[in-house]
């Protein structure tokens, strides 16, 4: 998808690790497995005669529909991961994401209060982390998921240093 309309000119985006697709797929599989299992319970209960409602077509249709939605997400996940990027500029950090609804967020270094790194079990197993930026604004939800752990640590130190330098200049 073209992004020229929202991308600032002259920016070279750094992309997150392709291994982040695996993290998203594991999360997808666990969540959807539980969802389809729960939505299939009425089908099981109707088939063994415990319930008379819902009708068989509805008991089959609801989990089938959710399974189709889950498979659609399966197709989208690799594209969503490829759309995530970031760029460091002199005074701010740019973060982009989205396929259909694209977004570019600009976080000035002087507004950063602290930079946090987190990693769940799947991320840790793949050597990845998520970098979160906390600013003075409660509404800021800036983060870069799927970074290699070394890049996340480097970025955390660099952004913290830049934030302190800009904050001291205020």
How would you name each of these model-derived features?
Residues 1-110, 114-170:
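N-terminal basic, Ser/Thr-rich segments that initiate or prime the first beta/alpha elements at protein or domain
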